[in-house]
A protein has these predicted regions:
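N-terminal FAD cofactor-binding segment of flavoenzymes
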Residues: 23-81, 100, 169
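Flavin-binding catalytic cores
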Residues: 222-253, 270-273, 294-316
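C-terminal helical "tail/cap" subdomain of flavin- and related membrane-associated enzymes
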Residues: 298-406
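Predominantly flavin-linked oxidoreductase catalytic cores and closely associated redox partners
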Residues: 23, 27, 108-247, 260-264
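N-terminal Rossmann-like FAD-binding beta1-loop-alpha1 element of flavoenzymes
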Residues: 2-38
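FAD-binding beta-loop-beta segment adjacent to the flavin cofactor pocket
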Residues: 193-199, 255-274, 327-350
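Short hydrophobic core segments
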Residues: 9-11, 39, 142-155, 272-277
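A conserved beta-strand/loop capping segment in the N-terminal third of enzymes
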Residues: 55-128, 134
């Protein structure tokens, strides 16, 4: 058995694991460098596929030089085609591919030891914790660490009252003539058939006048099958966007993100902590994760360099999560139509306030001003319903989708 020791073990090389490794590779002035080992799964089903991450923040962010694209305007369309377009002021909507992020992080983390192991177990031990698993060649392996930061999905989903999936399937399209406005993101286009419960919308990230990532996204209890996604995307790209059959699919992106009101434990043992989606970084009402991962890993790195236990802070305030729980339950039970709620919010709420709200950074007074734009009676009924509904474990037969941070 291969046995090693380190101060900090990071399990998983997705957005959270890579972000934390990058921060720990560059100690602040006066801080002692830490021995860090990043353990990622060997190539195969346990390693996440290439994917795209999006978020909004002011221009001049730390990853701006790594971006595939960014935009200063967003557009939302209602089911009837009513269009709301908003400038983002000093913010940009940013797109970064996981392949580019990993390549840039690898260039900047030479001091971080990397291991391709399948981790089967993380257990506490005196003075820290240890990872047990096997190498890519199938040899037993053990790594002892003072601290473990684990970004893998838990073995079983935590108890919840509502369980939806944000599932999406996208085509990277090229057209023979200009077909897209590269200055505006089509954030939510509800001109697609809507399910009885949940919602569905189109999503377009224009990379040039003749290139774009075009996605079909649904919020529902179950994803579609491959044929269903092909039909939905063919309808959206061909008929709604007016591209017909005159386009070429150059690549495909797909993913499933659990959206629940579960409470995600951020501590799994005296020296073991969860980060990323496993630590609650996914916003339940939107599926966005990357920006919260950056806040979370920054706090973890600060704690480690200061010699403190690296307990990740809550990714979102309790008040924001309570509001999300109500919205998810109302969507799941068909009490509100997302195709009506989201366009109204973008139409009636100032964009700067709405973006703060979606980030969980608004005050209680601002939350009230946003909430007044939502259908009050269905949401109040849902509040009463949730007050008496306990969180329950997921059914044993329920598939556990691997989170793909968006």
């Amino acid at each position: 058995m291969r046995e090693r020791e380190t101060e900090v073990a990071i399990v998983g090389a997705g957005a959270a694991g890579l972000s934390l490794a990058l921060r720990l590779a560059h100690p602040p002035p006066g801080a002692r460098p830490l021995a860090v080992t990043l353990v990622e799964a060997p190539a195969g089903p346990l390693r996440p596929p290439p994917r795209t991450w999006c978020w909004w923040e002011p221009a001049g962010g730390p990853f701006d030089g790594w971006l595939t694209a960014s935009w200063s305007r967003l557009r939302v369309r209602g089911p009837d085609g009513d269009t709301i377009e908003r400038g983002l002021g000093g913010c940009r909507y940013k797109m970064l591919t996981s392949a580019d992020f990993e390549a840039r992080v690898r260039e900047r983390t030479g001091a971080v030891e990397r291991r391709e192991w399948t981790v089967r177990r993380v257990r506490s031990r005196a003075g820290g914790a240890e990872l047990l698993g096997e190498t890519a060649e199938g040899q037993p392996a053990r790594l002892r660490a003072r601290w473990v930061l684990d970004s893998r999905p838990p073995a079983a989903p935590p108890p919840a009252r509502t369980r939806l999936l944000q599932h999406f399937h996208g085509w990277f399209l090229r057209t023979p003539r200009p077909a897209f406005d590269p200055t505006v993101v089509e954030l939510m286009d509800f001109r697609v058939p809507q399910p009885a419960e949940g919602l569905a919308f189109g999503y377009v990230l224009p990379l040039a006048e003749d290139r774009a990532l075009v996605e079909y996204t649904g919020f529902s209890r179950r994803p579609l099958d491959d044929a269903g996604y092909r039909r939905a995307l063919a309808h959206y790209a061909g008929r709604v966007l007016g591209l017909g059959d005159d386009h070429r699919v150059e690549a495909v992106e797909r993913g499933v993100i659990p959206l629940t009101d579960a409470r995600h434990p951020r501590r799994a043992g005296p020296a073991v902590f969860r980060i990323g989606a496993a630590g609650g970084a996914t916003r339940p009402s939107t599926g966005y994760t990357f920006a919260a991962v950056q806040r979370q890993t920054a706090a973890v790195a600060d704690a480690l360099f200061a010699g403190r236990a690296p307990l990740p802070p809550p990714a979102y305030p309790a008040r924001a999560l309570a509001l999300d729980a109500v919205l998810l339950a109302a969507l799941d039970r068909g009490r509100v139509r997302g195709a009506d709620v989201f366009p109204r919010l973008f139409r009636e709420v100032p964009i700067a306030r709405l973006l703060r709200f979606l980030d969980g950074r608004t005050s209680p007074a601002e939350d009230l001003t946003v909430g007044r734009r939502a259908p009050a009676l269905p949401l109040l009924r849902t509040v009463v319903d949730l007050a008496v509904r306990p969180r329950r474990a997921a059914p044993p037969a329920a598939a556990r989708p691997a989170p793909v941070p968006r």
